[in-house]
C-alpha cells in the first residue's frame, strides 16, 4: 500500500491548523475560568510561612457565622475542602500539588453557589506565587500571617527573601491584612505599587492561635 505524498507546505499547514486549534482551546478555557472566578465576588488568598491553614479555617468559620456562603480550600499534606454548610471533604489530587488545581476549585465554588472563596496559598516558588495570583485567583483580599525563613532552598536565605516572595500574592486594587510582624518593606512596598488598601493587624506577643484568630477576625470585620 502506497501512502499519499504530503508536501512540506501541506505538513506545515496541518501543524499550523493544529496549533491554532490548541491556542483557541486554551483561550476558551481561560475565559471560562475567568468567568467562574469572577462569579465569586469575594476571593481571599491566605499566605505566610506558618498559620495559613488555621487562619483560612477561622476566616471561613467567621464568615459562615455571618451568613455567608463560603467555600474554603486548605492545602498541605491533607488538603481539605470546607463546604458552605461547614462539612469537610478531602480535596482530591491525582498527582503532585499544582497551582492549576485552583481552576477546579473555582469550578466547585460556582457549583456550590459560594459568594466567598477562601484559598490557602499553595505555592512556594516566587514565579508560582505570582502566577497563582495574577492568572488564577485575582484575590479581592490578601492575608499574610508571617514571613519567616522557611524553604530557603527555594526562596533564598536573605532575611527578606520570604517577604519578597510572599509579596507577590498581593492583589491589585484589593485589600491586604498583614500581621504586624510581617509588615516589612517588601510587603508594604508591593501593596503601595498595587494600590492595595493595607491593614496592619497587631499580633506581637500573642500565642500563635490568638494571633491567627485576631488576623482572621480583622478580615471579617
PLM regions: where:
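Short, basic phosphate-binding NTP loop
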Residues: 2-47, 54-58, 66, 202
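Catalytic cores of large soluble enzymes that bind and process phosphate-bearing ligands
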Residues: 12-19, 51, 94-98, 154, ...
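N-terminal glycine-rich "phosphate-gripper" loop used for MgATP/nucleotide binding
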Residues: 26, 123, 181
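Residue-level recognition of alpha-helix initiation/capping sites
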Residues: 28, 54, 100, 182, ...
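ATP-dependent carboxylate-amine ligase catalytic core
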Residues: 34-41, 60-142, 146-164, 185
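Acidic, Mg2+-coordinating active-site environments of NTP-dependent enzymes
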Residues: 41, 112-118, 139-221
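Short polar catalytic/cofactor-binding loops
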Residues: 49-50, 76
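Active-site signature of alpha/beta-hydrolase-fold catalytic machinery across serine-
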Residues: 57-61, 218
Amino acid at each position: 500500500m502506497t501512502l499519499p505524498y504530503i508536501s512540506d507546505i501541506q505538513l506545515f499547514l496541518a501543524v499550523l491548523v493544529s496549533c491554532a486549534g490548541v491556542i483557541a482551546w486554551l483561550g476558551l478555557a481561560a475565559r471560562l475560568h475567568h468567568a467562574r472566578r469572577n462569579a465569586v465576588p469575594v476571593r481571599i488568598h491566605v499566605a505566610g510561612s506558618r498559620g495559613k491553614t488555621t487562619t483560612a479555617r477561622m476566616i471561613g468559620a467567621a464568615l459562615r457565622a455571618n451568613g455567608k456562603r463560603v467555600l474554603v480550600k486548605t492545602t498541605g499534606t491533607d488538603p481539605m475542602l470546607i463546604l458552605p454548610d461547614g462539612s469537610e471533604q478531602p480535596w482530591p489530587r491525582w498527582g503532585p500539588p499544582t497551582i492549576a488545581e485552583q481552576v477546579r476549585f473555582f469550578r466547585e465554588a460556582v457549583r456550590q453557589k459560594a459568594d466567598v472563596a477562601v484559598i490557602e496559598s499553595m505555592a512556594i516558588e516566587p514565579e508560582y506565587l505570582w502566577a497563582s495570583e495574577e492568572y488564577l485567583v485575582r484575590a479581592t483580599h490578601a492575608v499574610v500571617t508571617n514571613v519567616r525563613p522557611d524553604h530557603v532552598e527555594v526562596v533564598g536565605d536573605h532575611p527578606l527573601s520570604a517577604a519578597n516572595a510572599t509579596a507577590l500574592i498581593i492583589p491589585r486594587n484589593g485589600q491586604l491584612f498583614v500581621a504586624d510582624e510581617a509588615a516589612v518593606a517588601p510587603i508594604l512596598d508591593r501593596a503601595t505599587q498595587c494600590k492595595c488598601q493595607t491593614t496592619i493587624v497587631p499580633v506581637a506577643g500573642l500565642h500563635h492561635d490568638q494571633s491567627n484568630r485576631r488576623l482572621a477576625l480583622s478580615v471579617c470585620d
